[in-house]
Amino acid sequence: MNRWITVSVITWMMIITTHFAAMAQSELSGIEEDGIWMDWRERMKLLNYTPRYFGPNAFPFSELTDGRIGNRWELELRGEYHEAAGDRTADLFARLFIPIADGRAGVEMSGVVGETYQMSRTTQLRRHAAERRPPEYCIGDFILRSFYQVVRSDRWLDLMLSANLKTASGNRLADARYTDAASYWFDATAGRDLFRLDDGRVALRLQGMLGFYCWMTNDAVYRQNDALLFGAGLSGRLYNVSFAADYSGFSGYKNTGDHPATYRYKLEYEYRKNILSLRFRYGVYDNLYDSFSVGYIRCF
């Protein structure tokens, strides 16, 4: 009897040990792909470098502005929350804008300084991601933007050009959060007042954007994806309160999840060069995320 008890205990211990070892191995670095266990380094080759299969901050593009470059320094810190089916992401975003030549040009530096996320098992498998949560500190890409005022006219319209570069400084490519590859885009933004009262303190403005967006991929044949960048919307001001709404996105040529678009809404209140900013973004097509953010901007 004692012999059978000993054999049973040893058997159960072996089963339990094997079960937890398999779970630990799967969580650490391996997932079954179509019934075949693959190391995370091999699964990185299966990543799809498009907005549909990456995190919410992997493919940034221009905010639709009113076509005028500001003449004040701006330092912004913004907390953001993004939610899609099977993915919840929170991050801290920072931005510094420096005007040049009294608003005739400008330079902006920005990026996500910290990000955390939680993906479902289904989303992890769909994206071929290694982990569902960040195993280490996750940081985003550094973005450098330059602006040039081409036309500034209260009577006709304002026209602004921008050149933008996203570096490969972000990490967690293995989790499909950032691409670890550079991208760049150029755009022209135009704006015109529909009406303007009280020296511009009450105004409604129509604005639009058109440009070119390009990013590097892991495709062995077509190493980059090119896209048409677009946007249209309205902005307004009522003394210390400003608001904006637009529909923007870009459209790539590969049709592999590269057609993201977003409805963006912004409400801001300014008091003595301090701005409180509330934003909401509703993703459509290949942008699967809805986003909400609260930001503070200090002007100098």
Where on the chain are the PLM-derived regions?
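C-terminal segment of classical bacterial N-terminal signal peptides
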Residues: 14-22
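Transmembrane beta-barrel domains of Gram-negative outer membranes and organellar outer membranes
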Residues: 24-167, 182-189, 195, 241-246, ...
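Transmembrane beta-strands of outer-membrane beta-barrel pores
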Residues: 79-83, 111-117, 150, 163-171, ...
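Outer-membrane beta-barrel domain signature
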Residues: 50, 64, 81-87, 131-135, ...
